[in-house]
Amino acid sequence: MYQLFTANSKTEKILREYINSRENIKNKLDKLKENPYKANSAHQLHGKLKGKWACWLGSNIRAIYIIDLKNHQIIIEAVGTHKIY
């Protein structure tokens, strides 16, 4: 299982707000920790975000993250609507 981190305090604050306002996001984060490659329709990004991953945390909420294989960590860089791309 992977550990979950945020890249900065702004992302952490936004993620906490979503967790507090939506019941199912915590469950989706748990699924992400189990398998960051397939959970919540995870997919690799292209273009300027190449090397990063994205997944759905809710109907219109996405997370952009990096997978650190060596340390078994998921580092969430951004959370929000599709505008975060």
What is each residue range found by the language model?
Residues D30-C55:
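A short, surface-exposed loop/turn module that caps and links secondary-structure elements
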Residues M1-R16, K26, A39, A54-Y85:
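Enriched for short, Lys/Arg-rich terminal
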Residues Y18-R22:
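Hot-dog-fold acyl-thioester-processing enzymes
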Residues E23-L29:
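Short amphipathic alpha-helical segments
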